[in-house]
From Swiss-Prot:
It comes from Eremothecium gossypii (strain ATCC 10895 / CBS 109.51 / FGSC 9923 / NRRL Y-1056) (Yeast). InterPro entries: Ndc80_Spc24, Spc24_Fungi_globular_sf. Belongs to the SPC24 family. This is Probable kinetochore protein SPC24. It is found in: Nucleus; Chromosome, Centromere, Kinetochore. Component of the NDC80 complex, which consists of NDC80, NUF2, SPC24 and SPC25.
Amino acid sequence: MPSQAPGPDVLENPADLLRQTRENFSIAHDLQLLNATEENLRRLMQRTQQLEAKGAQELSELQAQQTERAQAAEAMRAEKETQAQHLQALTHSQDLVRLANELEELEQQLVSLRAELDEGMTQLLQTSEPTAAFQGDAEHEQQSPEVQTNLLKLQLYSSLGVTLDTEHNQALIERGDAAGIDLIALEDDSLSPFFRTKYVWDRL
């Protein structure tokens, strides 16, 4: 590096100017500066790479944690949905059991009412005086109690507005509100005795 400006005599002699210029520069010092600068750049790049690697690792860990939390939240949501479905199914099952029990009780009551009705008709037939219609029938005394009970049932149904159509195996029900006549099949396996009885009584 130059330490001082060349004097007038040196400018007049170019050879002396070159020699003096070489003497004023320190190559060793400049090499040290270059080496130091290169070392600083190397350390700076190394530190930058370390920070980048650390940042990338932390970002990867954060992404992994976020993925795990999202999966855990989805699993909890699915579990809650499954529990809700199980609870709903259990509630429906309990309702079905309750309705089945109620239906069974109603059918038992229907059977009991039928038995009481048959017994009452039989007693009425045994204790009542023969009607005018049966007095003129010579074969009435030959009829069995079952036939007599069935005849009494037919009379009762007829008095309530129910007519049996034996030709078509159906019952004709005259509605109590004078809205017309309803029909119900008597030999339809898809209809239970409970349904038939309820259907008839609802329309009387």
